[in-house]
């Protein structure tokens, strides 16, 4: 057994030499490429089964190892981010809504970027955003940009809407508490198109349950809505008042103004279509 252990340790402490390697003046094996030691002596007077040296990384071995580790780390990061995005967006179209694809015309882009840059503070102090304003002013887009940027930092975000939530709850009523708990487990929850859900008694009760649970979780919430701040601050009835009171206490209001980007995009497509038709006509 002893001979077997000695053989194993000898193999471990032995250094494999390449053809271009050489022995330096200090008696150690040197790399023929980077000319740094591939061995190191044990502390003075110390040996291991008669050997006074052990393998060491030369500079090029270290560089190769670090490069490999960086590649593996990068791959793990990409896989993690891809999984977060797959799970985090209920609308696949939103996966292309990023700061990189933003045209820079929305004046609230910097406000959205600030949230990402200040995420640790926003999370610690439970600060959310309430993006409110007219249809097509970029509220959902910038909310998705925030989600993407945080996911790139490996922060789990769920961006959904109450139409989806209510459908999910109706389909799995027995797991209602578990479903809401899962929503509240995300470090950041984004509710898109808030206020557009059906206003039935059941629907409003579920909306309040989600908002209230998120409030009690102490985790930030971002919501987008076409409702005005006036409508949110002066609701029409008690059920809406309960919901809006919770929402406005969690989220700082951010107003979105300006032109309807969707209408502009539609107009651009129409003009492009006319141009293509004209080109075809001229080519005939």
What function would you assign to each model-found segment?
Residues 107-116, 124, 147-188, 198-205:
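Short glycine-rich substrate-engagement loop in P-loop NTPases that contacts/grips substrate
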Residues 95-129:
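Pre-Walker A (pre-P-loop) alpha-helix and adjacent loop at the N terminus of AAA/AAA+ ATPase modules
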Residues 1-103, 264-284:
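A short, basic N-terminal segment
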Residues 127-131, 187-189, 221:
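Generic beta-sheet signal
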Residues 123-143:
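Walker A/P-loop nucleotide-binding motif
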Residues 60, 104, 162, 256-258:
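Active-site donor-binding loop signature of nucleotide-sugar glycosyltransferases
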Residues 193-194:
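Walker B catalytic acidic pair
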């Amino acid at each position: 057994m002893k001979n077997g252990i000695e053989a194993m340790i000898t193999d471990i402490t032995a250094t494999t030499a390449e053809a271009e390697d050489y022995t330096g003046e200090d008696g150690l094996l040197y790399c023929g490429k980077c000319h740094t030691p591939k061995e190191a002596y044990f502390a003075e007077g110390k040996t291991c089964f008669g050997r006074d040296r052990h393998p060491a990384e030369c500079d090029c071995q270290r560089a190769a190892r670090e490069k490999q580790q960086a590649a593996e780390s990068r791959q793990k990061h990409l896989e993690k981010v891809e999984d977060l995005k797959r799970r985090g967006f209920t609308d696949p179209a939103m996966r292309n809504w990023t700061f990189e694809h933003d045209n820079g015309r929305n004046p609230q882009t910097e406000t959205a970027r600030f949230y990402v840059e200040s995420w640790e503070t926003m999370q610690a102090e439970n600060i959310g955003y309430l993006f409110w304003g007219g249809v097509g002013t970029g509220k959902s887009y910038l909310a998705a940009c925030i989600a993407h940027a945080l996911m790139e930092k490996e922060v789990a975000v769920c961006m959904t809407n109450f139409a989806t939530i209510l459908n999910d709850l109706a389909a799995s009523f027995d797991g209602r508490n578990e479903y809401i708990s899962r929503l509240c487990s995300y470090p950041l929850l984004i509710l898109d198109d808030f206020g557009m859900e059906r206003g039935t008694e059941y629907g409003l009760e579920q909306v309040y349950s989600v908002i209230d649970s998120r409030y009690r979780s102490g985790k930030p919430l971002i919501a987008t809505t076409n409702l005005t701040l006036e409508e949110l601050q002066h609701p029409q009835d008690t059920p809406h008042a309960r919901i809006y009171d919770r929402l406005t206490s969690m989220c700082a209001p951010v107003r979105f103004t300006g032109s309807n980007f969707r209408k502009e995009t539609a107009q651009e497509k129409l003009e492009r279509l006319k141009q293509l038709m004209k080109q075809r006509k001229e080519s005939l």
